[in-house]
């Protein structure tokens, strides 16, 4: 999705324009060959359809989730998924940047295994007890079956929240750094739109409002439900 500067003004399609200066901004998006090959195999070889092109999922999600006004004012669409976090930036009505960060909600689960939990138990603990801040249930404990499957032990919710909050802060900080590196940090007047399974963690909205208060005028949480 290239965009252009025509005599200093942003244009999506400069065709037929008269200008003394034309600058094209083009994003190069890379992906492993294996991913494209698998898509082509399924669509063309197995389904017998013609593949017109392959579009990056984060950009498509952002294009349908953000309103035209948000895109024009400057907005950041963040999909905090299980293993990755996608950041898509729009400004002046056009796509500006995409970055996929190599961590997400699963990293919270992996961090919780440091409490001598299996990954399966850590995920269950995350879903039932973890929060994105440490200011709740500080004195609360819960009992879980030990690794031997026989004995039991108690774990403080505060310890769980410390791991979860630290990781969530790191993810948010990397999103901020991505926007800052793009050079439009102070121009995001349309705010941030957050979605993905990672934001289902308790008190995530509280953490977001705390961490992004200096550079966002609006924070929105989107949760999509598959009705099927």
Each language-model region and where it sits:
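Glycine-rich phosphate-binding loops at beta-strand->alpha-helix junctions
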Residues: 132-134, 187-211
């Amino acid at each position: 999705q290239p965009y252009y500067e025509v005599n200093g003004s942003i244009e999506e399609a400069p065709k037929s324009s008269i200008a003394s200066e034309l600058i094209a901004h083009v994003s190069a998006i890379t992906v492993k060959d294996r991913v494209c090959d698998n898509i082509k195999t399924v669509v063309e070889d197995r389904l017998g359809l013609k593949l017109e092109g392959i579009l990056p999922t984060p950009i498509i999600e952002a294009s349908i989730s953000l309103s035209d006004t948000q895109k024009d004012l400057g907005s950041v669409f963040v999909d905090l998924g299980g293993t990755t976090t996608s950041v898509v930036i729009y400004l002046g009505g056009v796509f500006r940047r995409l970055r996929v960060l190599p961590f997400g909600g699963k990293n919270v689960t992996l961090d919780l295994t440091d409490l001598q939990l299996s990954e399966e138990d850590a995920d269950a603990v995350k879903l039932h007890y973890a929060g994105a801040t440490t200011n709740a249930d500080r004195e609360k404990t819960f009992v879980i079956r030990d690794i031997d499957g026989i004995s039991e032990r108690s774990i403080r919710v505060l310890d769980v929240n410390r791991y979860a909050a630290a990781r969530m802060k790191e993810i948010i900080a990397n999103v901020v750094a991505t926007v800052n590196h793009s050079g439009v940090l102070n121009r995001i007047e349309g705010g941030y739109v957050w979605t993905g399974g990672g934001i289902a963690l308790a008190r995530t909205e509280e953490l977001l409002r705390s961490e992004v208060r200096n550079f966002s005028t609006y924070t929105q949480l989107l949760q999509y439900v598959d009705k099927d």
